[in-house]
Structure formats: structure tokens, C-alpha cells
Amino acid sequence: MIVSDDVVFEAKQISKLFPGVKALDGVDLTLRAGRLTTLLGENGAGKSTLMKILAGVQPPDEGELLVQGEPVHFTSPRDAQDHGIAMIHQELSLVPDLTVAENIFLGREPLRFETLIDYTELNRQANEWLKRLELDVSPTTPVRRLRVGQQQLVEIARALAGNVRILIMDEPTSAITERETEVLFRCIADLKKQGVAIVYITHRLEELEQIADDIVVMRDGCLIGTAEFGELSHDAMVRMMVGRDVKILSKQSSSNNQPVLRAEGISLSHPTRPGDYLVHEVDMHVCKGEVLGIFGLMGAGRTELLECLFGLHPTASTGQVSMHDRSVRLRNPADAISHGLALVPEDRKQDGLVLSMSVGENASLASLKHAERFGFIDRGREREHTRRFVERFRVKTPSLREKIINLSGGNQQKVILAKWLATGPAVLMLDEPTRGIDIHAKNEIYSLINELTADGLAVIMVSSELPEVMAVSDRILVMCEGRATQSFDRSEATEENILQAALPRRNSIPC
């Protein structure tokens, strides 16, 4: 057993330069066995870049890495893995067409006769990890059929299944439920007892009390400070992260009672279980200038409800939708857009962006008709149309030609918002809009929501963060197992009654 105070990893004076920006500037980091080091900072602070260097994904331009006091040079993630380093990425790195078990043991599959994969043993071992994480899916299920939160748990299982000495966790709880987070924290406690050194990136400061030993704060690619947990207050950590005090913005209540969208009896059949439903007989409405928050545990049907309203399941869904008191048919997303609906999806990189394209190209994708001229795209019109929205949403980018993949998560999310606001919607649907972004970027999103609703836009927001739902929403619809179980006005909503309504029950209510 390694003594808990022993240094197992050091990064010295690490620097990394990307075109137009110095992502890391002389950063030091020390990891000790059996301790969890929390890495804090805004999006764009350099946290993920530093972790990718530690995990062998990217090489440093300057500096030195040492494992157990010995200098190392990683040319690939495999090199890092050979030194006992594993990373759980915030943005999922699973292979969609492989099964859960194949993803967990990818590259280290159990073999028969030294050449053939032993699928019986593969599935058995995978099932043990799924049980440990209390994930109720079959190891033979293709990953593409899992929801984002379930995929995140598979990503965690893959990292834990390796013989790790140093574990890097980048926002591991951003897409999982509170219960699943508790399971993960128990696994973390076990790993610490085994002498594993853990680096943990999070924007959820309330998690630190349960798991953190050491705190490292970064800002603008530089190391700002280090401390043991307990030496810094919550406000002090935030000040170090952003360089100033930050006040969480909340929604200014709307008094408008004019429905823009009304949905009645929305149901979505389960794709593999005849007679079962992912969404069942949900009634709801949202008014002009209002934020309707939708809360529920994983599997409650929140995302599927938004997808039905956006025309993504025309053959499997039923129910009536009206816009401005006129019945509409939503056979596909084009129909939804034409009727004034917009959807910011849960997984921004998979479903919301084209990563190989520029900021400007991404921002214009949903509104190219505004740039059309004689059947062709007028690039000048396209740039002018999208520039207004990119500037309004204060997207931090060197230019509209910058590749979207080079932007921070918060700025990528603002580009997606700009894309959909450029279509001139009446109803904006947001699915986990602040997932994986820092407290300052969250405040910017909240501020934009306030601005948009003040202009009369109706907003439907799905979020797994209960304090966020309560702060931003005028009304809250709670879902469980595909059904609407309760609706609360802002004045009557409490954490207790919302959570009680999120537990399994069989009543359906109008919202």
C-alpha cells in the first residue's frame, strides 16, 4: 500500500500554445496517493487541456511530467495507460456501435487461445462493473441506444475497470442523477482507500465537501492557488476562479398568461417494449415571456417530451399540439421550426454542433434561408446575419471563422443559442443548457434567458439541477416514468415537494 502522503505524479511548468491563445502558462500540479485533488476554474481556464496532457491525449509544448519521480514522455493515451493513468472525459469518447461491454474493455478484452475475444467472460466482467455502478442495462446493449447519463456511467466503468493508479475525472456528474452521483462517490472513496490518486474537475462546488482533499484553482491558463479543502470558503473559491464576486442570477417572474404553445395527451411509445411508453399522456402549456422548467430523474421522459414537440418521433408519438391557439402538425424538425419552435439539445457536441465547421457556419445552420440569394448562399449575408447574434450573446471567439471545436463549452453553448435564436422562434426549448459549463458561463446563460423572456419569448427548460430549475422558472412541471406528476407555481415550489413529485407515482396532471 502506498502511503497517502507519497507523491505519485508531478507536472512542472507545463505550457501549451494553440493558434491565437496560450492555453497553459507554466502550470505546476502535484498528485498524492489516496487523495482527491479538485481542479477548479472557468471554462477556458485550461483545466481540460492540462488533463489531456496528463492523459497522453496532447503533448505539452514546454514542461516536464514525472510518474513516481521518473520523467515520462507520453506520445499517446496508451502510453499514459501503461503508467496507470486513466481519464473519464466530459465529452463522451465511447464507440456508439459497440456494446456496453465492448466499450468498457476496449483494447483490453479477455481472450481465448490468445487470439479470440472471450465474449462470455467479457460480458460477465462488464456486468460486475454495471452492478457496482447500479446501472440497469445489459452489457450487450449497443451504446448508441443509451441516454447521455447512462453513457456517462459506462465511461466511468471503463476507466475504473482498468488497473489505475491515477484517475482523471472531467465533470463526471454533469449528466447523471443524484442517486448515481452517490454511487460514484462511494466508488471514489473505495479508490482512495486503495491508494489511487484522483484529479476531479467540477463546477458543482457543493460536491467538494463529500470528496475533496486538495483544491487547485486555475484561471486563463495559469495556476492561481492551491489549498487543502476547508481552508477556502465557497465565495473565496469563486473569487479565485473568476477574479471577482459572482452573484447567481434568478428569473424575474412573468405575469403573462397568454399561452404560446399547448400540448395535450403527448405520448411516445417505447421502441422495444410494446405497450410501454417513454412519455405517456402529458398535458402542458407555456406562455409568452415565461420559463416553464421541467424536472425529473433520469428516465423520466423529459428529453423525449421535447423531442416529440420538435417533430423527432412523428410515427411513434401521439397527441395534439397548438401554437397561438391553432392546431399544428409536427412531422419533422422542419415543421417545428416553421411553426416557431427551436430545440437546444442535451448533447451539444453530438447533436448541436458540426465540430469541423466554423463558429459562423454553425451559427447560421438553422437559418440559411436568410442568406439565400438566387438559390445560392451569399456568404456576406450569412456573416452579417450571424454576427448580430454572436455579438448579442457575447461569444468569445477570435473571429467567425474560428473552428467551433476550439471554443470553451460555455461559448459553444452560446453559439447553439445564437443558431436557434437566428430562426426567430416563439418557443425556445433548452435541454440541460448549463451542463458542463462554469458558474460564470451559467450566469451568462441565465441572463440571456431573462433578456429573451423579457422580449416575449417562451422558454421550456429541462434541467437536472434542482436549484437551477427553482431559480430560473416561473412554473415547474415534474415528470416521473414518462408521466407528469405535479405542477408548481414559482411561489409554492420547494425542494421537498418537487423531489417528492419526482418519485414514482401514477397520476397525470395538466400543466
Curated annotation (Swiss-Prot):
An annotated Gene Ontology molecular function: ATP binding
SMART domains: AAA (SM00382)
Oligomer and partners: The complex is composed of an ATP-binding protein (RbsA), two transmembrane proteins (RbsC) and a solute-binding protein (RbsB).
Domain ABC transporter per the UniProt entry, residue ranges: 9-245, 261-506
Residues where ATP binds: 41-48
Predominant place of localization: membrane
Enzyme Commission designation: 7.5.2.7
Gene name as annotated: rbsA
Gene3D superfamilies: P-loop containing nucleotide triphosphate hydrolases (3.40.50.300)
GO CC annotations, alphabetized: plasma membrane
Protein name, entry field: Ribose import ATP-binding protein RbsA
InterPro entries: AAA+_ATPase, ABC_carbohydrate_import_ATPase, ABC_transporter-like_ATP-bd, ABC_transporter-like_CS, P-loop_NTPase
Protein family according to the UniProt entry: Belongs to the ABC transporter superfamily. Ribose importer (TC 3.A.1.2.1) family.
Physiological role: Part of the ABC transporter complex RbsABC involved in ribose import. Responsible for energy coupling to the transport system.
Reactions the enzyme catalyzes: D-ribose(out) + ATP + H2O = D-ribose(in) + ADP + phosphate + H(+)
Keyword annotations from UniProtKB, A to Z: ATP-binding, Cell inner membrane, Cell membrane, Membrane, Nucleotide-binding, Repeat, Sugar transport, Translocase, Transport
Location(s), subcellular: Cell inner membrane
